[in-house]
Amino acid sequence: MPERSQRVVLVRHTLDPEALTALGARLCYAGGDVDRLLKTIEEKDQRAFVERVMAMGHESVLEHASFTFLVEGVSRVLLAQLTRHRIASFSVQSQRYVSYAGGFGYIVPPAIRALGSDAEAEYHAQMAQMQAWYEGWQKRLGDAGEKSNEDARFVLPGACETRVLLTMNARELRHFFSLRM
């Protein structure tokens, strides 16, 4: 199966996350009723206020805004790093319910690609060998669909391409970017 390109799509997000964040912050620091707080937020841009609150280290207000992304063309290895961010929700393409008979997508690391065409050809040949092993195990396990996929998948490499739908609140997204970007 050919290599796929990476793709990240923002599929949903909190409407007006800045205003929602500002509401959370103003609720912490202001007296009065909710109607007055909402009116304050509607009347002026909240960016400077949110930045000031963030500079004070009050980041919990970011947790009210969330963002959901669909990520394709990434390796299972990347997935292992991504899911270390536990203040997030993940739905991952299953290697049990999705059969890779006929070919699995995989990621070629840039360092291997940089070694030149011979190294890259060797890598592709190794992926083809793993595909053959996978299909061989499926057959030995009785081509029983999900049941044989479940055990055959253990020979698939960390480079195996996957998809993930993930949702993070703004605070965790900011933390994620500080570590991973």
What are these regions (language model features)?
Residues 1-181:
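Family-specific signature for flavin-dependent thymidylate synthase
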